Amino acid sequence: MSLSRVSVTGVRNLHPVTLSPSPRINILYGANGSGKTSVLEAIHLLGIARSFRSSRLLPVIQYEQPSCTVFGQVDLAQGGHSNLGVSRDRQGEFQIRIDGQNARSAAQLAEILPLQLINPDSFRLLEGAPKIRRQFLDWGVFHVEPRFMATWQRLQKALKQRNSWLRHGTLDAASQAAWDRELCSASDEIDEFRRAYIKALKPVFEQTLSELVELEGLTLSYYRGWDKEKELSTVLASSIHRDQQMGHTQAGPQRADLRLRLGAHNAADILSRGQQKLVVCALRIAQGHLVSQVRRGQCIYLVDDLPSELDDNHRRALCRLLEELRCQVFITCVDQEFLREGWQTETPVALFHVEQGRITQTHDHRE
């Protein structure tokens, strides 16, 4: 799948624009602050209904504009296309449209337009809180396991009920036991989905990483959120008093984590920033491979400021891997010469110059 048209209005400093990107490689170049990252942000908004630069959408709306809107036409792998639209106004009203119909949730967008983001904050996947790694893990499971979303919703409902009971004691013993059974059932299913996903991801990640950088002894493992030798029901029963003191459930899938270690050490503690970025790139490219194996279609990659923290050899290796995925890629850089050359002659490459919010296509992939 790929975006064949993108229209952006009212997003940060960008002038209203409609782009016809290449189905493969798209390079956006221009000075810092010109609006390159805002283009990626608009596409991210279209696919996830969230910004990767701000936890709130209000700052995304252009100054003195009533709203921001992004439309896109997605060419589907199975043929045909789908029209997506996302709009948010200053009063907080949010609208998601898919083929002319209001969508129920952002998950419907994500299913049609799977996005992967690689940017200067990518190292947070290694250094940041476990929540970031759970989001990475569950993105992958969501796109390859059709039962995941319904089970995840069951888990969240049961967990919410149990945490409410822990804080307020509003359930009788029979109701509490019923919700605990539901929580354990959903937790076991989520754990099964995640475990199967990591088993499939590990060899692809290891192969991808070996093509980017040599890091002997780097291992990827999965912690499910409770003792692997015990049933969750046993753990919950033994920790009930501590959970009541804390006011929330301390064991379960909501405490899961991915662990990357180099020998006996946490990888984030000893890898350079550039090495961390390469590890994250390998993880995200491996995810793209798995999506393409399970679904008819590819992820779309948003790569912001690719040259930063990578030398020429590693930059070329990363571009080669992205090219081999045969997916659509949007890459930003200051100088187009960093990225213009080196692609295969049969790979369609489009160039867009961004200056003070104005976007001009300087090379059409169809030429």
UniProtKB/Swiss-Prot annotation:
Its main location: cytoplasm. InterPro entries: DNA-binding_RecF, DNA-binding_RecF_CS, P-loop_NTPase, RecF/RecN/SMC_N, RecF_2. Coiled coil: none annotated. PROSITE patterns: RECF_1 (PS00617), RECF_2 (PS00618). Keywords: ATP-binding, Cytoplasm, DNA damage, DNA repair, DNA replication, DNA-binding, Nucleotide-binding, SOS response. It comes from Pseudomonas syringae pv. syringae (strain B728a). Belongs to the RecF family. GO terms for cellular component: cytoplasm. This is DNA replication and repair protein RecF. ATP binds at residues 30-37. The RecF protein is involved in DNA metabolism; it is required for DNA replication and normal SOS inducibility. RecF binds preferentially to single-stranded, linear DNA. It also seems to bind ATP. HAMAP family: RecF (MF_00365). It is found in: Cytoplasm. It comes from the Bacteria. One of its GO terms (biological process) is DNA replication. GO terms for molecular function: ATP binding; single-stranded DNA binding. PANTHER family: DNA REPLICATION AND REPAIR PROTEIN RECF.
